[in-house]
A protein has these predicted regions:
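Catalytic cores of the polymerase beta-like nucleotidyltransferase superfamily
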Residues: 1-414
């Protein structure tokens, strides 16, 4: 197995100083799978202070648990001392850790066999728990007793599902049965951590595997709104964008269901509100003319409209023909290329201009601006001061808010 040069440099520095050191965990797994590891983590028998003595630039990122971050050029690498975890009284974190000189003790505390492989500087691999075999069999299997692993940390339940979705692996039988038994323990996991795993699932290449949430009996423990989820392989055809994919997943429910679930899970507002907005957008009929398309662009904005088209093309939001979507996309491009006015702020006449015409501030003023915009959406050629003044005066007369003809007239009466 090939080890990147900087990682090799760290490993060799440590071994030359008399310590053991290995790349470990997800980076080794991903390298075996031909995937580019996001991070390279290193495990060692050296104590944190000994690690710090070997490198010029370090950060104490988790010194209590034996982790030091080494900075090399523009990269950072976490180096953690071999350890044995104590009891997990909160079902999430070890109450204590004890450092150990034995690599095997460190590896057997980990979650799944595919995450237990360690690689030396020369590329040789230590695989004590059958990680390579499980990679070859495309399966997720707990290290040792799965009941113990899930009792220690309930987040591992969702990590198993997430790895299954990301790697398109099956979950080994004993691991799956234990996972289901321990689903109630998810009450010990913060909503933010749960959502982080769900986001990784829905952004994966196999979001349809979210149906395992139901199969494993997990939904009652994390959010009843997920009963309305649509786990579909069609979601994978969409760009890996959270609000877009959550909109697809909740497309058979409604926007408020999506918003409620995501807000309850402490999602960022952009994702929660964006998903709800997209769902409302794909519920309506596809516009058939320029006015309807301008109105759609005015309400949702061009980015959201293009995402709605993507959702519709992928089959979400109800039946619609490819020809309808092609025409909608074509009209959208024409409107945007022409620079048509699509918002009140782009009208040739502003609210301040209306007040100077003698129209009183208040809800009526906003209504008049809305009327002006609607007329311009129907006919962009009306977006001139002269035309809009006439439209505003007609609208004001209809509302009993009649302006004077001269700019600045303050004597307008109802």
């Amino acid at each position: 197995m090939q080890v990147p040069q900087q990682v090799k440099q760290i490993l060799e520095t440590m071994t030359q100083a008399g310590f053991q050191a290995y790349a470990v965990g997800g980076c080794v797994r991903d390298a075996f799978l031909g995937r580019e590891p996001e991070d390279w983590d290193i495990t060692t028998d050296a104590l944190p202070e000994q690690v710090k003595s070997l490198f010029r630039r370090t950060v104490d990122t988790g010194i209590r648990h034996g982790t030091v971050t080494v900075l090399l050029k523009d990269r950072s690498y976490e180096i953690t001392t071999y350890r044995v975890d104590g009891a997990y009284s909160d079902g999430r974190h070890p109450d204590s850790v004890v450092f150990t000189p034995e690599l095997s003790e460190d590896l057997k505390r980990r979650d799944f066999t595919i995450n237990t492989m360690a690689c030396a500087a020369n590329g040789s691999v230590v695989d004590l728990f059958g990680g390579q075999e499980d990679l070859g069999q495309r399966r997720i299997r707990c290290v040792g007793d799965p009941d113990e692993r899930f009792t220690e940390d309930a987040l591992r339940i969702l990590r198993a599902l997430r790895f299954s979705a990301q790697l398109d692996f099956d979950i080994e039988g004993a691991t799956w049965e234990a996972l289901k038994r321990h689903a109630p323990n998810l009450v010990n996991v913060s909503r933010e951590r749960i959502l982080a795993e769900l986001n990784k699932m829905i952004l994966s290449g196999h979001p349809e595997k979210m149906d395992m949430l139901d199969e494993a009996g997990i939904i009652p423990w994390i959010g009843k709104e997920l009963e309305d989820l649509l786990p579909s392989s069609r979601i994978a055809a969409l760009p890996a964008k959270k609000d877009l994919r959550w909109a697809a997943a909740f497309s058979e429910a409604d926007g408020e269901t999506a918003r409620t679930f995501l807000k309850n899970m402490k999602s960022d507002n952009e994702t929660a509100d964006g998903a709800a907005l997209l769902i409302s957008g794909i519920r309506g009929a596809v516009p058939e003319d320029l006015y309807g398309t301008r109105r759609l662009l005015s309400v949702y904005g061009q980015d959201r409209v293009r995402e709605m088209i993507l959702l519709r093309r992928a089959g979400f939001g109800g039946p619609v023909s490819a020809e309808q979507l092609d025409l909608l996309e074509e009209r959208t491009d024409r409107i945007l290329s022409a620079g048509d006015c699509l918002a009140v702020r782009n009208l040739a006449l502003s609210g301040s201009d209306l007040i100077r015409m003698g129209i009183r501030p208040g809800p009526g003023l906003g209504s008049i601006l809305g009327t002006m915009l609607d007329r311009v959406l129907r006919d962009p050629g009306l977006n001139t001061r002269e035309c809009l003044e006439r439209i505003a005066e007609e609208a004001a007369e209809g509302r009993g808010n009649v302006p004077g003809r001269k700019s600045g007239n303050d004597d307008a009466s109802e």
